[in-house]
């Protein structure tokens, strides 16, 4: 009989969001009259920017003409999109990133998991706590961890607590680690990192031969000009960091699928024989073998983000969600709840009241206000006693959800 990858058996009972869906569906079946508002999973609600839609329509028409039809594209992405990204997202901010170092993909969630393909199994891996669950689960699947303990922490991972005491920015690890996951603006806490914060991490990585996986999926929500949008704004980061970005949240591409990963050509890691190998070459080989590239139509839509019209429309989308976040923060604070994040980020991190556990507060919010959020404990042990609320929803839903919370849960 064929055998399985036993590492999958080490995964906890259910991925966070399917468990939320199970509970919500059970409640909806028992209470069909309830009008449930979902502020849990970070999925966008507003339509694609008009500039992107028009570009995609034009691309569809091109696919219907033999003279302009496109078949397989380059696995790394079309150069015209990579150039626009390099110029607008990196070089404009003083980052020394070339278009050839940018790889277009169908999602940063995929890339943060797939990047492990090019790294060995004996690396020591550090994740923040709380953490986006994908970082942990993909390492479990890849065989980089032992079993989980009673708190849900996996043997072999180094957990870096993010708490109110450290402003939800982790301290440097006390031990040497090889791979470090950082996400700023942070999911789930909404915290941001200053240039000083990131400089400490870059210096640590260079001193220890570590690689930073920097998830910048929410950088478009930064409005404070003093905060870095990219880790490559920090001197030396080209030699120690891989950055992941996405069009999902700034341009509404969650259902369209387009993202990018930056692997500088100066970035190296060691082979088992001690020689240094360029990671760009390995990632390029991995993508060429396992990925056929993002649809031409979608890439034309992403390119339109960088047009004058596209930039204005994307900014309007981002501002819409940031205003939602402000409403959530203001209304929940009025209700007597302690809130973090929601500024320079689309997530609000709420301290659960009355000593309730994260899942107990989830159930209370669902049952009394018919509002769905995300239990903080689903993001790690340090998330217990917290709750994530997403600003990705319609204004009507955000205002109604916060009205219900004030009515039902005012502390």
Swiss-Prot record:
Disulfide bonds: none
Modified residues (N6-(pyridoxal phosphate)lysine): 249
Pfam families listed in its UniProt record: Aminotran_1_2 (PF00155)
GO biological process: lysine biosynthetic process via diaminopimelate, diaminopimelate-aminotransferase pathway
Gene3D superfamilies registered for this protein in UniProt: Aspartate Aminotransferase, domain 1, Type I PLP-dependent aspartate aminotransferase-like (Major domain)
EC number: 2.6.1.83
Molecular-function GO term, any one: pyridoxal phosphate binding
InterPro entries membership: Aminotransferase_I/II_large, DapL/ALD1, PyrdxlP-dep_Trfase, PyrdxlP-dep_Trfase_major, PyrdxlP-dep_Trfase_small
Record's keyword terms, sorted: Aminotransferase, Pyridoxal phosphate, Transferase
NCBIfam families hit by this protein: DAPAT_plant
Subunit and interaction comment: Homodimer.
Function as written in the Swiss-Prot or TrEMBL entry: Involved in the synthesis of meso-diaminopimelate (m-DAP or DL-DAP), required for both lysine and peptidoglycan biosynthesis. Catalyzes the direct conversion of tetrahydrodipicolinate to LL-diaminopimelate.
Protein name: LL-diaminopimelate aminotransferase
Annotated source species: Gloeothece citriformis (strain PCC 7424) (Cyanothece sp. (strain PCC 7424))
């Amino acid at each position: 009989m064929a055998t399985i990858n036993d590492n999958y058996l080490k995964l906890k009972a259910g991925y966070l969001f399917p468990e939320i869906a199970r509970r919500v569906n059970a409640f909806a079946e028992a209470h069909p009259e309830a009008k449930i508002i979902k502020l849990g999973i970070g999925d966008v609600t507003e339509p694609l920017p008009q500039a992107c839609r028009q570009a995609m329509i034009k691309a569809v028409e091109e696919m219907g003409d033999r003279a302009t039809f496109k078949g397989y594209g380059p696995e790394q992405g079309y150069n015209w999109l990579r150039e626009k990204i390099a110029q607008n997202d990196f070089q404009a901010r003083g980052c020394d990133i070339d278009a050839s170092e940018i790889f277009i993909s169908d999602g940063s969630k995929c890339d943060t998991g797939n990047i492990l393909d090019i790294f060995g199994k004996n690396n020591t891996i550090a994740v923040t706590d709380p953490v986006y669950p994908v970082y942990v689960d993909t390492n479990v699947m890849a065989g980089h961890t032992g079993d989980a303990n009673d708190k849900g922490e996996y043997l072999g991972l180094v957990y870096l607590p993010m708490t109110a005491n450290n402003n939800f920015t982790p301290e440097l690890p006390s031990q040497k680690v090889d791979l470090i996951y950082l996400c700023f603006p942070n999911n789930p806490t909404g915290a941001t990192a200053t240039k000083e914060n990131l400089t400490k991490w870059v210096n640590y990585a260079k001193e220890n031969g570590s690689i930073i996986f920097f998830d910048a999926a929410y950088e478009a929500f930064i409005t404070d000009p003093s905060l870095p949008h990219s880790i490559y704004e920090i001197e030396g980061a080209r030699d120690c960091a891989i950055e992941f970005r996405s069009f999902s949240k700034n341009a509404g591409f969650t259902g369209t699928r387009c993202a990018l990963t930056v692997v500088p050509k100066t970035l190296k890691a060691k082979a088992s024989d001690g020689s240094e190998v360029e990671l760009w070459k390995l990632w390029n080989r991995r993508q060429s073998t396992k990925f056929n590239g993002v649809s031409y139509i979608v890439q034309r839509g992403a390119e339109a983000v960088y047009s004058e019209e596209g930039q204005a429309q994307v900014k309007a989308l981002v501002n819409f969600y940031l205003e939602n976040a402000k409403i959530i923060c203001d209304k929940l604070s009025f209700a007597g709840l302690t809130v973090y994040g929601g500024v320079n980020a689309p997530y609000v991190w709420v301290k659960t009241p009355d000593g309730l556990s994260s899942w107990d507060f989830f159930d209370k919010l669902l049952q009394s206000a018919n509002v769905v959020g995300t239990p903080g404990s689903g993001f790690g042990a340090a998330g217990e006693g917290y709750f994530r609320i997403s600003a990705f929803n319609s204004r009507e839903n955000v205002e109604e959800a916060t009205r219900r919370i004030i009515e039902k849960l005012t502390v």
